[in-house]
């Protein structure tokens, strides 16, 4: 029992360290991609090809002064960013990186992540109010209204996933897509979810909570030094988290569709599934399947991250009224209609699946025999 507890503690610490390092080098990746799109070189002086630039930025922030505004609530001013980071990191404990690596495999994993993400909105309003700044408070109000609008969209889209997979467990949702990813079945929800992710994380072109020409830098305008770094870490941790969630919900996590490659040996033809091939090699090299699944999963996540950066480099910013109108008058009715269509089609074909997901249930039904 003690050894199991120590194992989970070490795994949790490893996960937190991994997230923080990923955030650090995601900033370098983002600056390099933006520089490439804009025909610049980007950071290339600090270390080989600028690889130490995140470390230099971290040291710069740590060594800066951390003034507290007059009449600010000191407890909330310092506690807001810290609680925001803790909530951002706590959502990671139910995210599976492959079939064997997950800190806590709970049956309501998707509901847990959605709940923890919703709690972040309370800390944003606390951070904006505690600094006693009009700009920070207006930025917090904007952020809250924006996040609530697009959390509704994300929640409705998640209902589609639950209907098709028959589960709220991340692992079961992944394996329900082993024959066909939900990105192909729910292609409209796939694109709507990506747009809602941009709005949920206050990313361009929906970064209206920190519009420089209107609100200086949003709800964290009075925070500097380590407190600003905590906001920065929590924001990018949420971006990476949503990319992981989207990969699991729509791109099948670490699974690949049953692509078959051809083997000809002594005039005998074999058709071997890629997943089955790696499971066969597992008897000789135990970690081969773990490595293969992890690489597939990481590549999918970085495709999402690249899309985030590409959107930032190419699209203009929306007006605030346009963003809210798009959320409440277009996305919410559209996603509700898509939910009813998904439920109707599911009931029309074979009813709700009890195990394995609707797609697997559909492909194994009599219609394909």
Swiss-Prot record:
The keyword Manganese does not apply. Disulfide bonds: none annotated. It is found in: Mitochondrion inner membrane. It catalyses: a ubiquinone + NADH + 5 H(+)(in) = a ubiquinol + NAD(+) + 4 H(+)(out). The keyword Cytoplasm does not apply. It holds the Pfam family NADHdh. Its EC number is 7.1.1.2. Keywords: Electron transport, Membrane, Mitochondrion, Mitochondrion inner membrane, NAD, Respiratory chain, Translocase, Transmembrane, Transmembrane helix, Transport, Ubiquinone. The chain crosses the membrane at residues 6-26, 43-63, 75-95, 108-128, 144-164, 180-200, 226-246, 248-268, 291-311, 330-350. Its main location: mitochondrion. GO terms for cellular component: mitochondrial inner membrane. GO terms for molecular function: NADH dehydrogenase (ubiquinone) activity. Belongs to the complex I subunit 1 family. Core subunit of the mitochondrial membrane respiratory chain NADH dehydrogenase (Complex I) that is believed to belong to the minimal assembly required for catalysis. Complex I functions in the transfer of electrons from NADH to the respiratory chain. The immediate electron acceptor for the enzyme is believed to be ubiquinone. This is NADH-ubiquinone oxidoreductase chain 1. The lineage of its organism: Eukaryota, Amoebozoa, Discosea, Longamoebia, Centramoebida. The gene is ND1.
